[in-house]
Amino acid sequence: MITVALIDDHLIVRSGFAQLLGLEPDLQVVAEFGSGREALAGLPGRGVQVCICDISMPDISGLELLSQLPKGMATIVLSVHDSPALVEQALNAGARGFLSKRCSPDELIAAVHTVATGGCYLTPDIAVKLAAGRQDPLTKRERQVAEKLAQGMAVKEIAAELGLSPKTVHVHRANLLEKLGVSNDVELAHRMFDGW
């Protein structure tokens, strides 16, 4: 029997996953948590083999939580975003699998079985994005905008310097945040200085 814990701040997501996993004869959901803090308090001693964790939670992000979970637990990260940079961040932080919240039930079940037996799991579409993203996830213009944002320039200043409209710079900024898996300009600057 593979024991599973679910960590997601949305009750309906946890309930749906618990019902789905409960249909499998060799899977048992033994714990559900609505926040990272609840999980840190409740996971030790539960004998959980696989943890399915939302990446975006209000108190502690799934990425931050990965380093604090009990050792020996295989973790699958869930996200509505599946940019190559975000997938890499999750894998580098210790995740054994990464699934989009749009994944099929079969993919979720396959991921649990795979990580429980020591493997790593990515859906084929995420694996393709990850491989393509390793080449260079940013366009030339996105890289220019990223450099200016990292220098602390305002959107209007960047637009004037690059001969773009402020709206276009905002679009490039939004694309950068998604591609790099960051949520603001400060995190973007850190990623720039870390070499992506």
From Swiss-Prot:
Report the residue ranges that make up the HTH luxR-type domain in this protein. Answer: 131-196
Q: Which GO terms describe its molecular function?
A: DNA binding
Modification after translation: Phosphorylated and dephosphorylated by UhpB.
A GO CC annotation given for this chain: cytoplasm
Positions of post-translational 4-aspartylphosphate modification: D54
GO BP, sorted A to Z: phosphorelay signal transduction system; regulation of DNA-templated transcription
Where is the Response regulatory domain positioned along the sequence?
Answer: 3-116
Cite a single Pfam family from the UniProt record.
Response_reg
Q: Which UniProt keywords apply?
A: Activator, Cytoplasm, DNA-binding, Phosphoprotein, Transcription, Transcription regulation, Two-component regulatory system
Question: Which residues form the DNA-binding region?
Answer: 155-174
Q: Which pairs of positions does the record mark as disulfide bonds?
A: none
Q: Where in the cell is it found?
A: Cytoplasm
Q: Which NCBIfam families match?
A: PRK10360.1
What does the UniProt function comment say about this protein? Part of the UhpABC signaling cascade that controls the expression of the hexose phosphate transporter UhpT. Activates the transcription of the uhpT gene. Acts by binding specifically to the uhpT promoter region.
Question: What name appears for this protein in its UniProt entry?
Answer: Transcriptional regulatory protein UhpA
